[in-house]
Swiss-Prot record:
The gene is ndk. ATP binds at K11, F59, R87, T93, R104, N114. The keyword rRNA-binding does not apply. It is found in: Cytoplasm. The active site is at H117. Its main location: cytoplasm. The lineage of its organism: Bacteria, Pseudomonadati, Pseudomonadota, Alphaproteobacteria, Hyphomicrobiales. This is Nucleoside diphosphate kinase. The keyword Cytoplasm applies. SMART domains: NDK. It comes from Xanthobacter autotrophicus (strain ATCC BAA-1158 / Py2).
Length: 140
């Protein structure tokens, strides 16, 4: 099986509570390598572009506001089946439905403030990675 890359965001609810290390520990324990990482303040334009697929949804404005409410940590993760593996490690979007030991079960505050984003496909991962990283910033 080929090595894949996926994109991750540690969301403002987690960074506000200084949980970056806790999230990274779950990621690395699951066998995903962090090959790029930076802490940023996402701009409104970045958030609107990133979540454009949800622009017609009623929660879009709140999502953009939340994602720009504090620092986020954007990451590139690498492993065999990285996309599926990270989605499993994150857990269900609603932390109440997330499996034990997942990021969202352990750390999320709510369905909105669920601590982590992960790409849903290899194709979307490539697009999402390119929005935040240049090639020389990925050092896997």
């Amino acid at each position: 099986m080929a090595i894949e890359r996926t994109f991750s965001i540690i969301k403002p609810d987690a960074t506000r509570r200084n949980l970056t290390g806790a999230v990274n520990a779950v990621i690395e324990t699951a066998g995903l390598r962090i090959v790029a990482q930076k802490r940023i303040l996402m701009t409104k334009a970045q958030a609107e572009t990133f979540y454009a697929v949800h622009s017609a949804r009623p929660f879009f404005g709140d999502l953009v506001s939340f994602m720009t409410s504090g620092p986020v940590v954007v990451q590139v993760l690498e492993a065999e089946n990285a996309v599926a593996k990270y989605r499993e490690v994150m857990g269900a979007t609603n932390p109440a439905n997330a499996a034990e030991g997942t990021i969202r079960k352990l750390l999320a505050e709510s369905i909105e403030a669920n601590s982590a984003h992960g790409s849903d496909s290899v194709e979307n991962a490539a697009v999402e990675i390119a929005q935040f990283f240049s090639g020389n910033e990925i050092v896997g």
